[in-house]
């Protein structure tokens, strides 16, 4: 199960849903630019 926008995550683990990426700075899923 992927994590949605704004959910906490661990950078590099690919936990976020499609189109999202884990922010190294804030440790939450943000929109992939």
UniProtKB/Swiss-Prot annotation:
Tissue specificity field: Expressed by the venom gland.
InterPro entries registered for this protein in UniProt: Huwentoxin-1, Huwentoxin_CS1
Top-rank taxon: Eukaryota
Keyword Secreted: yes
Pfam families named in the record: Toxin_12
Subcellular location: Secreted
Disulfide bond is among the record's keywords: yes
Disulfide bridges in this chain: 2-17, 9-22, 16-29
This protein's GO CC annotations: extracellular region
Single GO molecular function: ion channel inhibitor activity
PTM-bearing positions, type Leucine amide: 33
Primary location recorded for the protein, binned into one broad class: secreted
Keywords recorded for this protein, A-Z: Amidation, Disulfide bond, Ion channel impairing toxin, Neurotoxin, Secreted, Toxin, Voltage-gated sodium channel impairing toxin
Its job: Potently and reversibly inhibits some human voltage-gated sodium channels (Nav1.1/SCN1A (IC(50)=72.0 nM), Nav1.2/SCN2A (IC(50)=75.5 nM), Nav1.6/SCN8A (IC(50)=115.0 nM), Nav1.7/SCN9A (IC(50)=52.7-129.5 nM), Nav1.3/SCN3A (IC(50)=306.6 nM)). The hNav1.7/SCN9A channel inhibition occurs without any change in steady-state inactivation- and conductance-voltage relationships. On adult mouse DRG neurons, this toxin is approximately 1000-fold more efficient to inhibit tetrodotoxin (TTX)-sensitive than TTX-resistant sodium currents. In vivo, this toxin exhibits analgesic effects in mice pain models.
Additional comment: Shows low or no activity on hNav1.4/SCN4A (IC(50)=7.7 uM), hNav1.5/SCN5A (IC(50)>10 uM), hNav1.8/SCN10A (IC(50)>10 uM), hCav1.2/CACNA1C, hCav3.1/CACNA1G, hCav3.2CACNA1H, hKv7.1/KCNQ1, Kv11.1/KCNH2/ERG1, and hKir2.1/KCNJ2/IRK1 channels.
Assembly notes: Monomer.
Entry text on domains: The presence of a 'disulfide through disulfide knot' structurally defines this protein as a knottin.
Similarity remark: Belongs to the neurotoxin 10 (Hwtx-1) family. 14 (Hntx-1) subfamily.
Protein name as catalogued: Mu-theraphotoxin-Os1a
């Amino acid at each position: 199960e992927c994590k949605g926008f704004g959910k906490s995550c661990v950078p590099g683990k690919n936990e976020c849903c499609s189109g999202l990426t884990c922010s190294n700075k804030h440790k939450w899923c943000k929109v992939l630019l």
